[in-house]
Amino acid sequence: MDKLVIEGGQKLAGEIVVSGAKNAALPILCAGLLSAEPVHLDNVPDLQDVRTTLKLLGQMGVRTESADGKVSLDASKVDNLVAPYELVKTMRASILVLGPLVARFGEAKVSLPGGCAIGARPVDQHIKGLQAMGAEINIEHGFIEARAKRLKGARIITDMITVTGTENLLMAAVLADGETIIENAAREPEVGDLASLLVSMGAKIEGIGTDRLVIQGVDKLHGAKHTVVPDRIEAGTFLCAVAAAGGDVTLRHVRPQILEAVTDKLRDAGVTIEEGDDWMRVRMNQRPKAVSFRTSEYPAFPTDMQAQFMALNTLAEGTSQVVETIFENRFMHVQELNRLGANITIDGKTALVNGVEKLSGAKVMATDLRASASLVIAGLCADGETLIDRIYHLDRGYDRMESKLTAVGAKVRRIKGNQA
């Protein structure tokens, strides 16, 4: 397994170009299944999860081409409606083929998902919604099997806000017979980006960006061209890295307006942030102030930024409380941060972070995608050398992170698994 070695103590300066959003790219790739005509995408990040999704689509008979952030999909000859365990186990977002397959082909067989080890993320909301639209669903031998002659429009009220659930039901509804209303829908920008692609393919969707989506089903969708929204979590991660390590960095290809929950807290910590339409400049030359926060659904503070901001808080002046309301078991980075000298205690859904004056490099292990990013941030600040093991987690969600950090002055290098 590859490892990262970080020599801490370097200030960061320069420019970073932010990649397309992982959490938009994955559902958008799956949406290619909804049309027999080609879909052309731009600003697709080069990530392990994207490669896994393309492999999955390829096994179903979708012709895929990808190079330099551009991906073309041709689903005119889909001949396999099964998403196998071997691929789905590595990436939970594979469940997103379920809605498109049932909507366009009338059946699907999708393995129950895997992905990040951060607690139970049940697919029952996906299943209930599809059943409300007339799908017959059985779960046996580790697979979800769904059938429907044609899905029927329905009013769906999800029991909880679910991003992938909203996306799956939205993709199913665009080809259903009649009107579908999704209440308590996720409002994340990545859901809105998927909806924008679907509209450009001929779907009829109202309420994009709100918690109530109204979809008028159409008989078929056509091809389209679409540019994936910038990754707000990647941008937020780099903002926290500069805030923790110190320096002066400009981020390009960002949407500041979808990052406000994070930038508000960074300003509270003493960070200077300037913004334009598609850029942000972050400057920090002092010890951060401790900032408490609570994760919640968009537009509140994102759970996917909790670990990175906690890494910043480890070095802050004062004590902060971090409350995680979305996922249980999402404090696995705490014991690794403590190995670097942090002072964090956990009580249920709350972490109490007592800021320390310095961290010291050590060997640590990444446990999930965002936890690995928090260890990178801590390593940038720690005295001496930090070695992060199991960084395949990082590769699932960050496009060339170490080369982007190196370009702004960090001392980061990758040790290949066969050299470690």
UniProtKB/Swiss-Prot annotation:
Task: Give one Pfam family.
Answer: EPSP_synthase
Residue ranges annotated as coiled coil are none
Residue pairs linked by disulfide bridges in the UniProt entry: none
Q: What SUPFAM superfamilies does this protein map onto?
A: EPT/RTPC-like
InterPro entries assigned to the protein according to its UniProt record, in alphabetical order: Enolpyruvate_Tfrase_dom, Enolpyruvate_Tfrase_sf, MurA_subfamily, RNA3'P_cycl/enolpyr_Trfase_a/b, UDP_GlcNAc_COvinyl_MurA
Gene Ontology cellular component list: cytoplasm
Provide this UniProt record's keywords sorted from A to Z: Cell cycle, Cell division, Cell shape, Cell wall biogenesis/degradation, Cytoplasm, Peptidoglycan synthesis, Pyruvate, Transferase
Which pathway does it operate in? Cell wall biogenesis; peptidoglycan biosynthesis
Tree of life domain? Bacteria
Enumerate the active-site residues: 116
Reaction it catalyzes: phosphoenolpyruvate + UDP-N-acetyl-alpha-D-glucosamine = UDP-N-acetyl-3-O-(1-carboxyvinyl)-alpha-D-glucosamine + phosphate
Instruction: State the Gene3D superfamilies in the record.
Output: Enolpyruvate transferase domain
Give GO MF terms, alphabetically. UDP-N-acetylglucosamine 1-carboxyvinyltransferase activity
> What is the stated purpose of this protein?
Cell wall formation. Adds enolpyruvyl to UDP-N-acetylglucosamine.
Q: What is this protein called?
A: UDP-N-acetylglucosamine 1-carboxyvinyltransferase
Organism expressing this protein natively: Paraburkholderia phymatum (strain DSM 17167 / CIP 108236 / LMG 21445 / STM815) (Burkholderia phymatum)
Q: Which gene encodes it?
A: murA
